[in-house]
Amino acid sequence: NPFVNIVIMALIIIGGIGFLTWEDIKNNKFHFRKYRMQSKVILSVTVILIVVPAVYFFFFEYFNLPLGERILTSLFQSVTPRTAGFNTTDLSKFSETGQMMTLLLMLTGGAPGSTAGGMKITTVAVLVSSALSVFLRKEKTHFFKRRISDETVKSAATIFLMYIALFIGGGMIISRIENIPLLSSLFETASAIGTVGLSLGVTTGVGIVSQLILIVLMLIGGSPGSTAG
């Protein structure tokens, strides 16, 4: 049902951009230049994280669907992995590239102060901007002509490394214990630490140790100290 899909996507986006961003929108309407730097980053990156995966899904995963359904399904699949975990297709039938794209979206999550999990949009944005600054030989990291403090960059790097270590470590252990493909187990651990809920269908058959690993990852991913504002 297109209407149901659109409503769910709208609610996911509304809940995933954060309360402070909505305060900016309420107070400043559509005057983007008046927004806080964080709101500008969140809204800009959110658009990118919706459009780029949707284009990939449209051309490479859903090419056998009618045009209208293809567009809607591609958009839905690019929106839902970062927070809600609703699913309208069998993810196990995705190509490995499609599964990896979904996995990265689950790890990224939504905005700070939102209902979304993951390492947060701002964490990823700070790290990408910092990497570009190093590549371009700039001394400081900037967003929208404002400097990002070194402390913020360090905090983002710490959270990123923690997420990657837990996600990969948990995935490797589960893959070894359960004798399943590494990508499949990494998908499950990304879903757990991102507090998303999507699955390739392997979680229902894993043993108690693997279940405990996933539970711990969910608890860590849902704790306030595991993300940066």
PLM features per residue range, with description:
Residues 1-228:
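Membrane-proximal intracellular helices of multi-pass ion channels
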